[in-house]
Design a protein with these regions (language model features):
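N-terminal capping segment at the start of a domain
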Residues: 1-19, 230-231
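Flexible, glycine/charged-enriched surface loops at secondary-structure junctions
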Residues: 40, 195-201
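Short coil/turn connectors at secondary-structure junctions
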Residues: 44, 56-61, 124-127, 151-155, ...
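Zn-dependent metallopeptidase/amidohydrolase metal-coordination segment
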Residues: 199-241
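Acidic/histidine-rich catalytic neighborhood of metal-dependent amide-processing enzymes
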Residues: 101-185, 200-202, 208
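Conserved active-site and cofactor/substrate-binding residues in soluble primary-metabolism enzymes
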Residues: 3, 19, 23, 27, ...
């Protein structure tokens, strides 16, 4: 992953809230235009991106994130601090404050996912990316996902779990993948390397729940380094995000 701290700060500084996602959608569309990526928006403002550099691609990997947060719209000044990860180690972290120096909630849930998707789009030769609206109020965007976009998707990965040790196997009661599947057998060594204490978990809904419900491909979701999510004191441990 492109370890671009300034770009990460830029992504995290975009204010966005469920049903008030215009600034994030604008940020993403401007970025995608600047990079000349092939993308489109649907009527809900879900964003669908395809990067194809090989002619023989039959099925694409797909990464997804959501463009909303739970935090009210406010000025976001991203500040570097040193804060604990799950293991209690003090790490370089990012936290958000408004112009009155009050914590606002940085919205790593799921701006960390947005950053991860954009970073992978930069480095992988063939990839599909979906940015869904209003996940926090019931997967509103992903439940209306454009089915034609996913016709040639082989699997979907979401970056939308807190801290640095969680892998979502069940999401809102929906089984996302089989432990004995070729998909997870290929995933597992990467988790053991970058997330050595990972645990398979059952989590509330996120967008891969919708995709697994709608389509016949494996999905997975895992930790991407945000802590104290849905609170004003939310922060992002940079190393954990890069590892994801």
């Amino acid at each position: 992953m492109t370890q671009d701290l300034e770009f990460l700060k830029q992504v995290l500084s975009v204010p966005t809230k469920s049903r008030q996602e215009g600034l994030m959608v604008e940020f993403l569309t401007n970025y995608l235009k600047e990079k000349n990526y092939d993308f489109y928006l649907d009527a809900m403002s879900n964003i669908y991106v395809t990067k194809k550099t090989s002619d023989d691609v039959e099925y694409f990997p797909c990464v997804v994130s959501h463009t909303d947060t739970v935090h009210k719209l406010d000025t976001i000044n991203v500040v570097q601090e040193y804060l604990p990860n799950y293991q209690g180690e003090i790490k370089l972290s990012l936290k958000a404050y408004n112009n009155m120096d009050e914590p606002t909630g940085i919205g790593g849930d799921d701006k960390c996912g947005v950053f991860a998707c954009l970073s992978l789009l930069e480095i992988l030769p063939n990839l599909k990316v979906a940015f869904f609206v209003s996940e926090e109020i019931g997967c509103v965007g992903s439940l209306k996902a454009d089915k034609t976009f996913f016709d040639n998707v082989g699997y979907a990965i979401q970056f939308d779990a807190p801290e640095n040790w969680m892998v979502t196997q069940y999401c809102y009661g929906q089984k996302l993948f089989d432990e004995q599947s070729e998909f997870f057998i290929k995933c597992e060594p990467n988790f053991k390397e970058m997330m050595p204490n990972f645990v398979l978990e059952s989590h509330p809904y996120t967008d891969v729940y919708s995709l697994r419900k709608l389509f016949d491909f494996s999905c997975i979701n895992f930790s991407c380094g945000y802590y104290q999510y849905h609170t004003r004191n939310e922060y992002v441990v940079v190393e954990d995000l890069y590892n994801s």
